[in-house]
């Protein structure tokens, strides 16, 4: 039985196994706190994320279960990886992952990025997305603060709490507004992996310019700003809008022509602008896919089709439509955690034996 120790962090009790020491607060979110810590077993610095009250409601239980399942399933160099998970005696859940020194949001607010860093960061984002999308997963909340970077410029996408299955009837308010794809704002119904490409395009533009491309004050203003640059959506895109109110709003906007992005990004090279043009397309069906974007001339210095892996198997979303009580989610969560530790122990045994 693991020994647990308690520490007070920012008024919150962290109840963690004695394996982790030197806790320091590094981030706060709506659903949890993240601390850095030292792993006594490996001597490595790690991030410990406490999920607040994971069993307080069925919705929170399901959200936590989904994030746990995704972290277990997604194994890729550009995706944050799980190194430990446990439930404390107080029934809080803790995810332990590798610790990266900073995130893209902090980098972008501290100084302009040089061209080779922009290229390398975008390459790694798209490499991670190619893998995630091949697993049948849409991140849905891609933004600079969810993209972690270390001192070697290795990049990892994190925070899969909002991630969803590709396709049927996806729901509206999800990602941070500046990076939200127009089809999420317009249809509030069906969308797919292309929403992540739009978000990556917004992040790419921000790396080039040093400031957000579409800093909307609200949804109406956000959409208006997008049309000022990209023009009015094509009629066949407008026809996909499900909400009558949204349809009326879009039809009431003045007709606008798409502006050449080269005029907006005067200091960017033509290849960068061309890739951005292919990422920021109103019609998701015509938006470039991660795999295609990786092969674009702008990313030629890093592109290696033999080292851009896809998932071995699709993620199992069968639980996602389940409407279950908290106790059932709890049993399922315990089962997943036991499975994680059993598999982990088997892998270590195999490595030690080889």
Swiss-Prot record:
This is Mitogen-activated protein kinase HOG1. PROSITE patterns: MAPK, PROTEIN_KINASE_ATP, PROTEIN_KINASE_DOM, PROTEIN_KINASE_ST. The active site is at residue 141. Residues 20-299 form the Protein kinase domain. It comes from Cochliobolus miyabeanus (Brown spot disease fungus). Keywords: Activator, ATP-binding, Cytoplasm, Kinase, Nucleotide-binding, Nucleus, Phosphoprotein, Serine/threonine-protein kinase, Transcription, Transcription regulation, Transferase. It catalyses: L-seryl-[protein] + ATP = O-phospho-L-seryl-[protein] + ADP + H(+); L-threonyl-[protein] + ATP = O-phospho-L-threonyl-[protein] + ADP + H(+). Belongs to the protein kinase superfamily. Ser/Thr protein kinase family. MAP kinase subfamily. HOG1 sub-subfamily. The gene is HOG1. Its main location: cytoplasm. ATP binds at residues 26-34, 49. InterPro entries: Kinase-like_dom_sf, MAP_kinase, MAP_kinase_CS, MAPK_p38-like, MAPK_Sty1/Hog1, Prot_kinase_dom, Protein_kinase_ATP_BS, Ser/Thr_kinase_AS.
């Amino acid at each position: 039985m693991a020994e647990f120790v308690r520490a007070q962090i920012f008024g919150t009790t962290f109840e963690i196994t004695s394996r982790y020491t030197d806790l320091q607060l590094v981030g706060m979110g709506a659903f949890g706190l993240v601390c850095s810590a030292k792993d006594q077993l490996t001597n490595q610095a790690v991030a410990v994320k406490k999920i607040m009250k994971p069993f307080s409601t069925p919705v929170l239980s399901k959200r936590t279960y989904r994030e746990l399942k995704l972290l277990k399933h997604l194994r890729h160099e550009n995706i944050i990886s799980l190194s430990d998970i446990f439930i404390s005696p107080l029934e809080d859940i803790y995810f332990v992952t590798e610790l990266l020194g900073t995130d893209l949001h902090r980098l972008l607010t501290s100084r302009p990025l040089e061209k080779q860093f922009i290229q390398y960061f975008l390459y790694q984002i798209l490499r991670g997305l190619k893998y995630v999308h091949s697993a049948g997963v849409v991140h849905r909340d891609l933004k600079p603060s969810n993209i972690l970077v270390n001192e070697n410029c290795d990049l990892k996408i994190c925070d899969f709490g909002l991630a969803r299955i590709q396709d049927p009837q996806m729901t509206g308010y999800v990602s941070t507004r500046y990076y939200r794809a127009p089809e999420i704002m317009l249809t509030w119904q069906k969308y797919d992996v292309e929403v992540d490409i739009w978000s990556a395009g917004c992040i790419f533009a921000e790396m080039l310019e040093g400031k957000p491309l579409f800093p909307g004050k609200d949804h109406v203003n956000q959409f208006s700003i997008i049309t000022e640059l990209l023009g009015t959506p094509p009629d066949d895109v407008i026809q996909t809008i499900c909400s009558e109110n949204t349809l009326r709003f879009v039809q009431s906007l003045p007709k606008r022509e798409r502006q050449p992005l080269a005029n907006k990004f005067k200091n960017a090279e033509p290849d960068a602008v061309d890739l951005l043009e292919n990422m920021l397309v109103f019609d998701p069906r015509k938006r470039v896919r991660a795999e295609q974007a990786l092969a674009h001339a702008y990313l030629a210095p890093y592109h290696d089709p033999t080292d851009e892996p896809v998932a071995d198997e699709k993620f199992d979303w069968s639980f996602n439509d389940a409407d279950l009580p908290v106790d059932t989610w709890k049993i399922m969560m315990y089962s997943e955690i036991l499975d994680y530790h059993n598999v982990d122990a088997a892998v270590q045994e195999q490595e030690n034996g080889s």
